[in-house]
């Protein structure tokens, strides 16, 4: 790793408990290996709302509404070491969390 590179880890999940747990694991692992951390930064929650008619034919007033919330977090690891990268690769996160990793100069 170059000394001036940063690792940006972006997490997405529908369950806020899972994303908080995964974020805590990433932060603890990075701190344990001696890297500096920026975050976790909570990003805006994306809310999708769906309205479905409950009746197949009549009663337009009878509807159900559903909401799907996507929680997002950003963790930036400043000046990571080889030890940090190895520890993050071995980390086993929850199945309901989408992880995107990018390198930033």
UniProtKB/Swiss-Prot annotation:
<dbReference type="GO" id="GO:0003735">
    <property type="term" value="F:structural constituent of ribosome"/>
</dbReference>
<keyword id="KW-0687">Ribonucleoprotein</keyword>
<comment type="similarity">
    <text>Belongs to the universal ribosomal protein uS10 family.</text>
</comment>
<keyword id="KW-0689">Ribosomal protein</keyword>
<dbReference type="InterPro" id="IPR001848">
    <property type="entry name" value="Ribosomal_uS10"/>
</dbReference>
<dbReference type="GO" id="GO:0000049">
    <property type="term" value="F:tRNA binding"/>
</dbReference>
<dbReference type="GO" id="GO:0005840">
    <property type="term" value="C:ribosome"/>
</dbReference>
<dbReference type="InterPro" id="IPR036838">
    <property type="entry name" value="Ribosomal_uS10_dom_sf"/>
</dbReference>
<dbReference type="InterPro" id="IPR027486">
    <property type="entry name" value="Ribosomal_uS10_dom"/>
</dbReference>
<protein>
    <recommendedName>
        <fullName>Small ribosomal subunit protein uS10</fullName>
    </recommendedName>
</protein>
<dbReference type="GO" id="GO:0006412">
    <property type="term" value="P:translation"/>
</dbReference>
<dbReference type="Pfam" id="PF00338">
    <property type="entry name" value="Ribosomal_S10"/>
</dbReference>
<comment type="function">
    <text>Involved in the binding of tRNA to the ribosomes.</text>
</comment>
<comment type="subunit">
    <text>Part of the 30S ribosomal subunit.</text>
</comment>
<dbReference type="GO" id="GO:1990904">
    <property type="term" value="C:ribonucleoprotein complex"/>
</dbReference>
